[in-house]
């Protein structure tokens, strides 16, 4: 579910890198880990792609067919529906069994994580209204806020922060949401949101001893935004 499996500067992320053998099966990988591929982000490919258009043009019948296949596994269906922005399905499943709201997949992602990284605000709102845990962490220690900030889903990140998400939560690699936003070249809005929050601690370091500003200075054209916190007590490298 984590859409990120490497840094944007081409350096593998130490807590998310995958070690593939020479003969790994790509189709099998897509089948088992397809949820790790971003569904709400823009591609850098500028050409025309009939295949991409076909992907975007799946009709209601296709979605209902997929739901029917998963109907006997409501937890799996809820995770899928949250990622695919199927609000009616999410509501139906939670009305039948509200405890599924915090169900998890094999990587410990919850429906809220999936909706957050996909940028589906309506789903996020519904899940939180039904008791979704904004502090839930994956096997790598990612919260839903990490997922939203990594993929520049600013409105989702803002809503999560309004509902007690920890802006300074750190993953197993000691990455904060600000670290992840700083490593995204398209994250201007999310960086502004985080840096203008009175509780943000931009001086926190990851396990490579880097602050978010260090990452932004290396990878982002928006490193100047860190001037927002320059001179603030929170901007000193302290936890």
From Swiss-Prot:
Pfam families: Ank, Ank_2. One of its GO terms (biological process) is spermatogenesis. The modification Phosphoserine is found at residue 49. It is found in: Nucleus. The keyword Nucleus applies. InterPro entries: Ankyrin_rpt, Ankyrin_rpt-contain_sf. The keyword Chaperone does not apply. ANK repeats lie at residues 73-103, 107-136, 140-169, 173-206. Keywords: ANK repeat, Differentiation, Nucleus, Phosphoprotein, Repeat, Spermatogenesis. Its main location: nucleus. Widely expressed in fetus, at a high level in fetal liver, brain and lung. One of its GO terms (cellular component) is nucleus. PANTHER family: ANKYRIN REPEAT AND PROTEIN KINASE DOMAIN-CONTAINING PROTEIN, ANKYRIN REPEAT-CONTAINING PROTEIN-RELATED. Induces HBG1 expression. May have a role in spermatogenesis where it promotes autophagy in response to serum starvation, via the NF-kappaB pathway. This is Ankyrin repeat domain-containing protein 49. The lineage of its organism: Eukaryota, Metazoa, Chordata, Craniata, Vertebrata.
């Amino acid at each position: 579910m984590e859409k990120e499996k490497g840094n944007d500067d081409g350096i593998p992320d130490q807590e998310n890198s995958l070690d593939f053998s020479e003969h790994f099966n790509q189709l099998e990988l897509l089948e088992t880990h397809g949820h790790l591929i971003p569904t709400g982000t823009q591609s850098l490919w500028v050409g025309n792609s009939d295949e991409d258009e076909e992907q975007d043009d799946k009709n209601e019948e296709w979605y209902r067919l997929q739901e029917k296949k998963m109907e006997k596994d409501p937890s799996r269906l809820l995770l899928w529906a949250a990622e695919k922005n199927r609000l009616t399905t999410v509501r139906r499943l939670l009305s039948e069994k509200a405890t599924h709201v915090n169900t998890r997949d094999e990587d410990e992602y919850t429906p809220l994580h999936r909706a957050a990284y996909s940028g589906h605000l309506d789903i996020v709102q519904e899940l939180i209204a039904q008791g979704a845990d904004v502090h839930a962490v994956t096997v790598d220690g990612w919260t839903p806020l990490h997922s939203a900030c990594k993929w520049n889903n600013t409105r989702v990140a803002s809503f999560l922060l309004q509902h007690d998400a920890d802006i300074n939560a750190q993953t197993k690699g000691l990455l904060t949401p600000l670290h992840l936003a700083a490593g995204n070249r398209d994250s201007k809005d999310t960086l502004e949101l985080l840096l203008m929050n009175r509780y943000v601690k931009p001086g926190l370091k990851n396990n490579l001893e880097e602050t978010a500003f260090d990452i932004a200075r290396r990878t982002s054209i928006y490193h100047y935004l860190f001037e927002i916190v320059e001179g603030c007590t929170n901007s000193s490298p302290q936890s």
